[in-house]
Design a protein with these regions (language model features):
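Class I S-adenosyl-L-methionine-dependent methyltransferase catalytic core
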Residues: 1-175
Length: 175
């Protein structure tokens, strides 16, 4: 059975990562650049928009790079992340649907250091038209993590949604 999205086509590739999730990962990685953002949903002090044409640009960064790619076409983003990790000498972290049966996942395994599966719940992304988290994600999520200076280990690790939420919400409360 195929699950179809009810999201309007103009919003399909514009969903924002929830702040609690980004904050939890930012503590670990120290993000400097959001390489797939809009002026409305950028999560870092520096970001690339559709107008910047991130797939044909250098991801110049002085810290780790965050990427929540358009889910309609993930493969070119996987290829670019692998390239830019080496060229920029920065860690790249990408959030993607947890689907290991697709071609882009096999491509990622050629270069990724870590596949971190988010367990115990699905991520509710921020809907572009409302700015609110929306339930009903049809798949779980995982993180693809490229690290420079090491041979890719292709590690599979897990982290629970609850653990990430506790860390990320703690950051917001402390701020």
């Amino acid at each position: 059975m195929t699950i179809k999205s009810n999201t309007p086509s103009h919003d399909k590739d514009c969903w924002q990562t929830p702040l609690w999730l980004f904050d939890a990962l930012d503590i670990e990685f120290g993000f400097w650049l959001d390489s797939a953002a809009s002026d409305k949903n950028a999560l870092c002090a520096h970001w690339l928009t559709e107008a910047d044409d991130a797939l044909n640009s250098e991801w110049v960064s002085h810290g780790a790079i965050w990427n929540n790619p358009p889910y309609s076409n993930i493969r070119p983003w996987v290829e670019k992340a692998a390239e830019q990790c080496i060229q920029q000498r920065q860690t790249v972290v990408m959030i993607v649907p947890e689907d290991m049966s697709v071609g882009w996942f096999s491509k990622a395994l050629e270069s990724v250091d870590e596949v971190r599966i988010i367990t115990d719940g699905r991520i509710n992304f921020i809907e572009p038209s409302t700015g609110l988290e929306k339930k009903g994600n049809s798949k779980g999520s995982m993180l693809l993590i490229w690290r420079p200076f090491i041979s890719p280990r292709r590690m599979f690790t897990t982290v629970s949604k609850a653990a990430l939420m506790a860390i990320g919400q703690g950051v917001r409360r402390a701020a």
